[in-house]
Amino acid sequence: MSRRRRNPFGKLSAGGVAVLLIVFVILYVFDMVGPEPKSTVEGECEFHFIDVGQGDSTLILSEGGVVVIDAGPQDHADSTERYIKSRTDTIDYLILTHPHEDHIGGADELFDSLKINNVILSDAYTDTLTFTRLLDKIEESGANVIEAKSGSTYIAGEIKLTILSPISEFSNLNDYSVVTKVEFGNTSAMITGDVEHHSEKLMIEEFGAYKLRCDIYQISHHGSSTSNCDSFMDAVSPEFAVIQSETGNSYGHPHRETIEKLEERNITYYRTDKMGHIVFVSDGEEVKLSD
């Protein structure tokens, strides 16, 4: 004699089963997107957006970890080197977003005065004297050279680095920029180089808004309208944004279109051309502008 399979829901009606299923789904979703567990990192992490004129350089410091992303232009190399050297004598990871002079021109001085353990860069190439000379410096230094691959992660003390881009090959060096999400506990920043709309849209497709979300967003390409598209800015949804550019630069950076996007979204933004060096401090749970 066959036996009927036991109903795991007992004598619940179909409606009761449906209610239980809805409750289970709600609990599952809450577990997936609910509050993050309290951070276990110790100490603080500093995010220094260095005033290098018309260029980019960012120093990230925590106990046991130092990361520098880009080194600004050559005409600010001495001041950039002094700023970084006054805070550390070793760089765990130097990330060079792409081979444009306003991002790598000051790197030679860093190799001359600091110990650099690892260098991350894309396979983008240009035959400019600035870039070829830098490649020689990297080789002479003995630093470990890492090709940037989307999805790769690296650890420097309590700092976690995730490479988001480049995802594909590009003819445009700006779109070849290494985009890095920097995480400290439950806080994060995104450093973008000069990445433009094409790469931004690829990152949305690859990672989705949940993984792109961050607290601090370095506005790409010094605030150019060829970068920072609406969909990417919505995905990143930062609390703070930083624009690194020089007063009276010939490019008109930051472009008005970019400023309007920030203001429409009520994103608090800061500019190195107005404030000089900009520093944020994170305790792993909250990010604040340093006094």
PLM regions: where:
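Non-globular, low-confidence helical/coil segments that flank catalytic cores
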Residues: 2-291
